[in-house]
Amino acid sequence: MLTNTNLFFFLSLLLLSCFLQVSSNGDAEILSRVKKTRLFDPDGNLQDWVITGDNRSPCNWTGITCHIRKGSSLAVTTIDLSGYNISGGFPYGFCRIRTLINITLSQNNLNGTIDSAPLSLCSKLQNLILNQNNFSGKLPEFSPEFRKLRVLELESNLFTGEIPQSYGRLTALQVLNLNGNPLSGIVPAFLGYLTELTRLDLAYISFDPSPIPSTLGNLSNLTDLRLTHSNLVGEIPDSIMNLVLLENLDLAMNSLTGEIPESIGRLESVYQIELYDNRLSGKLPESIGNLTELRNFDVSQNNLTGELPEKIAALQLISFNLNDNFFTGGLPDVVALNPNLVEFKIFNNSFTGTLPRNLGKFSEISEFDVSTNRFSGELPPYLCYRRKLQKIITFSNQLSGEIPESYGDCHSLNYIRMADNKLSGEVPARFWELPLTRLELANNNQLQGSIPPSISKARHLSQLEISANNFSGVIPVKLCDLRDLRVIDLSRNSFLGSIPSCINKLKNLERVEMQENMLDGEIPSSVSSCTELTELNLSNNRLRGGIPPELGDLPVLNYLDLSNNQLTGEIPAELLRLKLNQFNVSDNKLYGKIPSGFQQDIFRPSFLGNPNLCAPNLDPIRPCRSKRETRYILPISILCIVALTGALVWLFIKTKPLFKRKPKRTNKITIFQRVGFTEEDIYPQLTEDNIIGSGGSGLVYRVKLKSGQTLAVKKLWGETGQKTESESVFRSEVETLGRVRHGNIVKLLMCCNGEEFRFLVYEFMENGSLGDVLHSEKEHRAVSPLDWTTRFSIAVGAAQGLSYLHHDSVPPIVHRDVKSNNILLDHEMKPRVADFGLAKPLKREDNDGVSDVSMSCVAGSYGYIAPEYGYTSKVNEKSDVYSFGVVLLELITGKRPNDSSFGENKDIVKFAMEAALCYPSPSAEDGAMNQDSLGNYRDLSKLVDPKMKLSTREYEEIEKVLDVALLCTSSFPINRPTMRKVVELLKEKKSLE
């Protein structure tokens, strides 16, 4: 039986509970209405946002946090829907909840603009976090009523324009994060008056070139300043060094000049300094040595000089990066005493002296790169003392002595590059067994010993490069167990025995170099199973037997050198199937007639030193003659001379007027492939009737030879006003296509460089360009509308061609004019990337990336040009990735990049991004909406080309390819995948079906 006291307590709780429930009912109705009218929840994460008889309080709903407010009422204070995959516009209606102070909607697909008028409902907010969505338009303005706003995070959206002046009035603001938006203007000085700021992040914004405002030095509470990749110029203002609470200073990837201020030593709390990839000069200030809290220090890729001060070397750094500068002098021994050192990169400098012996003894060093310096002496024996070392890179120094035995016990090690040193002695036996992905000991070392069978334990090894040493013994059969091998370079050693026939197991091989050894036996025909092989060099050995005809089955082989061996037999005609850029079988014992396809001047040196080979008209190769033919040589020769003389006289009479009118042509002909025609077969066909296209650099002709073969001939403009451009196009096409061999890149067969004009001869693509097939309005076109299977195949093929240019060509090539009109289609609709008139070679970097190249003008075609052309002259292969993303969108939509149906100031990228989200847009904030109109998350029927008849499976596949296209067309190059990754993603999308 309850006592009076207990009864009173029970009734009080019951009354309070009822009051709390009633007070939150209004919040529940607001939330439910916003969900129905403004948000789309494809994954059903908000399915519990339902008002029922037993569940009228939202405090237990997903993403909702309630607190007891004044008056003992339970009310909604926080809405956090981050990562729930919701779409729609900004939910202004949330702000009708009077007690709401925090909104977090990060990592969703929300889009549209954020308008100032309805946003005023949210003036009581303290935290507004909208990172990683697709909001666009101008940054939202904030009225003076937003006096309590402390955190504003809008990172990784699509906001444009300048930072509004109203942001300077948000005096309570502690965090401002606008990272990764395509804003313009400059870093505004008024931000320096937001003195409560602790974090300011304006990284990865394409501001106009401008200096760092000195007013930022007023932000005395700032702990985190990020201005990475923000187009900053000028010197680092000394006022920044007044920020004594600063823990992170990131000014990397800009164009800052001048010296690092000596006053940097005042940043006594700083943990990380990132100044890499600028144009800073001078010496490192010794005052940096006073920063005892500093753990990450990166000043790489600048123009810094001088020696490394011992005081800085003594800092307890975790990451220490000085690479790509002009530092000189020795490396202080004290750097080895650092117990925190994990990453040490000082490559591409001019350091001298020896490496400190105790490096690695006191720290768990993981990555060690001292390459391209002038270090001498021995390798530090304790680098892997703590068993954490993963990468050791020491190439291009003068290091000597043996590889320490201790390295053989370093099972954490997976990447070794020690080429171009003076190392000697035997490689430790256990060294070969390490779980490496790359082992490079090549060039100018004097290492010796043999490759043990235990190398099979290095199961993930992809590159084995040990050329120019004193290695000997046989090539172990166990090498064939390394199924990930892409490169084998054993050249310029003393290996004996035969090439293992099990080489056919290495399906990923791309390059095999075994030249200048003492290998004997026969070339294994099984090598024909290595279908990725592009280069095979077995020259200067003692190989016997015949050339395997199976070599002709290697689909992408473009370099074959078998010279200086003891090979016998005839040259297999099957080799004519290869698309060879380099071919050499000279100095062997080959005999018989050279296959007709090789009987060209370009191949003449390839056959020298084989006295028993013969071919007509290929001096100094002897002509092929039989004994029976010899008796008839004289009379036949006389008859031929008489006939030829008569023909010449007749020809002279017929063409005499032409000779009077026109001087003799002097043309330089270069042949890049085996061809059965000459320039004289082409000249007469360059008529107006055969023109099939024209462009900025010249006319394109369709030329059909008497043999039935059809060619495409590009005749470049020769007029004075256009000669410079045509010369540039001619040179670019020849320098790129002349050495590129890939199944998805158009073949350049021949070029003619004459006084009157230049022309380039290509294989003819029967189905024209992808742009013609997709967009042609001619009703008589032979090509029917492309189905999705064909479009997808074209996308993958074109991606593979571009991937080859970016990642497998040496040097890498950026196309700069990727578009649907430059993707040609053969009779099987197989794509070929074409038109390399704007192509540029890039410099490959050590980390397998490529450097930027400066462009004097914007290159490319309207609708395909990457956004970064608008704010920088330095572009890299990521501009091609953007253009390819546009092509993917063309394949999906069937529309041109700037189709008028998109509306004013909108291109195919914006159209696809908006259409992909497919959310309802009610006219009023709380306006009603027909739920039947929602459909699926992505209503692709409004996006895809209506000419395609698609199955459900194909719709799903298109949605996945659309994701790849939108990734490729990201506003920031750093967010775009490489073309190699694009190929992987596309193939993954197909394999998922």
UniProtKB/Swiss-Prot annotation:
Glycosylation sites: 60, 85, 102, 111, 134, 218, 221, 290, 303, 348, 470, 537, 584
LRR repeats: 75-96, 99-120, 124-146, 148-170, 172-192, 196-217, 221-243, 245-267, 269-291, 293-315, 316-338, 364-386, 388-410, 412-433, 435-458, 460-481, 484-507, 508-530, 532-555, 556-579, 580-601
Pfam families the UniProt entry points to: LRR_1, LRR_4, LRRNT_2, Pkinase
GO MF, one example: ATP binding
Topology with respect to the bilayer: Single-pass type I membrane protein
PTM annotation (Phosphothreonine): residues: 678, 872
Residue positions where Phosphoserine is found in the record: 856
PANTHER family: LRR RECEPTOR-LIKE SERINE/THREONINE-PROTEIN KINASE-RELATED, LRR RECEPTOR-LIKE SERINE_THREONINE-PROTEIN KINASE HSL2
UniProt name for this protein: LRR receptor-like serine/threonine-protein kinase HSL2
Organism of this sequence: Arabidopsis thaliana (Mouse-ear cress)
Lineage: Eukaryota, Viridiplantae, Streptophyta, Embryophyta, Tracheophyta
Gene that produces this protein: HSL2
